[in-house]
Amino acid sequence: MQTEIQSSSLRHHPYRRARLPRSDEETRASLTEQHPLLPDCDHADYHNVSSVRGLPCAAGFTLLQEFPVPWDMILTPEEIKILKRCMSVCLCPATLDLVRAQMVSGYERWILHCHCSSPGSLQCRAGGTLLAVWFRRVIYGCMFNQRFPWYRQIVNRNMPKEIMYMGSVFMRGRHLIYCRIWYDGHVGSIIPNMSFGWSALNYGLLNNMVIMCCTYCENMAEIRMRCCARRTRRLMLKAVGIIVRETCDPDPICSSRTEPRRQRLLRALMERHRPILFSEYESVRSSHSTRL
């Protein structure tokens, strides 16, 4: 019995030493090229297949109401073969609706969907079950945000709302870094003019997300995590420079005055289970305080 409990805890532990080998096919965030494995979500033909309960450490994604997952970065080669042959999954398979609840407790249910041509079939239902297993591991990987709460503070210090770090997922030695670009026009300016390394772009219904994959901090040493945070911040500052140079916005780009308050709300939820009112989190969308 004790052996079964230990094996179960190891199976669900997001930091266990089941490292993935280095990938030979690293994708780049692009506006012109489709992702080779995961197409953009077509909201006209999807159907729900399963659901997964979230955790407070994933509240940063809950408030976005979308959770894009670049499966090619965190799945084994065998799992990717199953994904290609038996499933029809997009880059953003998980969504939820906060309009009715208006309060985030951290335990909301993510609804997973697929785009296969035979909804309700045995293959579709089996694929939905497997997708839920994978996505549950992604939720466990969000424990990174609770273990390293200072990562968001370092990266988002004095950053404008136009580009903002939203959270991380750590799974199988891969660190997925999620950055949101606020305006569609800025996406068109940033993506063609700089490289985010191994990355993917989710041009979603509610959010524009750049997901970067870092393998340098696979051992989760604090010094490597801080180096990773500084690298992420440098990339975001480069993107801010492109926005300033290529857009003719009469309003100056200023540091977000809502970000420190949002960080306090998220930490209170993760550490003390204090729910977040959606209206309180989204109350001020402007970014006027300090010029960059």
Curated annotation (Swiss-Prot):
Annotated TM spans: none
A GO term from the CC aspect: host cell nucleus
Domain of life of the organism encoding this protein: Viruses
Main location: host cell
Pfam families the UniProt entry points to: Adeno_E4_34
Keywords tagged on the record: Early protein, Host cytoplasm, Host nucleus
Location(s) in or outside the cell: Host nucleus; Host cytoplasm
Family: Belongs to the adenoviridae E4 30 to 34 kDa protein family.
Subunit and interaction comment: Interacts with E1B-55k.
Protein name per its UniProtKB record: Early E4 34 kDa protein
Provenance organism: Human adenovirus D serotype 9
